[in-house]
From Swiss-Prot:
Domain HTH arsR-type: 17-111
Function, as annotated: Represses an operon that probably comprises itself, PD_1892, PD_1893, PD_1894 and blh. Binds to a palindromic AT-rich sequence spanning the -10 region of the blh promoter and blocks transcription of the operon.
Gene Ontology molecular functions: DNA binding; DNA-binding transcription factor activity
Pfam families associated with the record: HTH_5
InterPro entries (UniProt xref): ArsR-like_HTH, HTH_ArsR_DNA-bd_dom, Metal_resp_trans_reg, WH-like_DNA-bd_sf, WH_DNA-bd_sf
Keyword Transcription regulation on entry: yes
DNA-binding region: 51-74
Record protein name field: Biofilm growth-associated repressor
Keywords: DNA-binding, Repressor, Transcription, Transcription regulation
């Protein structure tokens, strides 16, 4: 199993490059480590949603939703667009979308096959 991973490794990196990448990945994983934030990003992979739509889709109350969206916004994973009185959120971080898709493949599609 570990040997399979070696076939997909990236070319050799310098220690400094590896450290920089490790910090980038750790920060992204830290941001996505909260269940509500992970559910939000999973939902936003599908497209742009208003706060009301996210609240309904995820089933989380407005205060918690706003707090977690704020964390995602501050980290640069999502951005907002205002349309009259509604605020819409969309994913801006491609790496977050790729990670969520990989997690979905690992954790969700295998359960369907079992």
């Amino acid at each position: 199993m570990v040997n399979e991973m070696r076939d997909n490794t990236v070319p050799h990196m310098t220690r400094e490059d590896m450290e920089k990448r490790a910090n980038e990945v750790a920060n992204l994983l830290k941001t996505l480590s909260h269940p509500v934030r992970l559910m939000l990003v999973c939902t936003l992979v599908e497209g742009e949603f208003s706060v009301g739509e996210l609240e309904q889709q995820i089933g989380i109350g407005q205060p918690t939703l706003s707090q977690q969206l704020g964390v995602l916004r501050e980290s640069g994973i999502v951005e907002t667009r205002r349309n009259i009185k509604q605020i819409f959120y969309r994913l801006t971080e491609a790496k977050a979308a790729q990670l969520v898709n990989a997690l979905y493949t690992i954790f969700c599609t295998q359960e369907k096959q079992a």
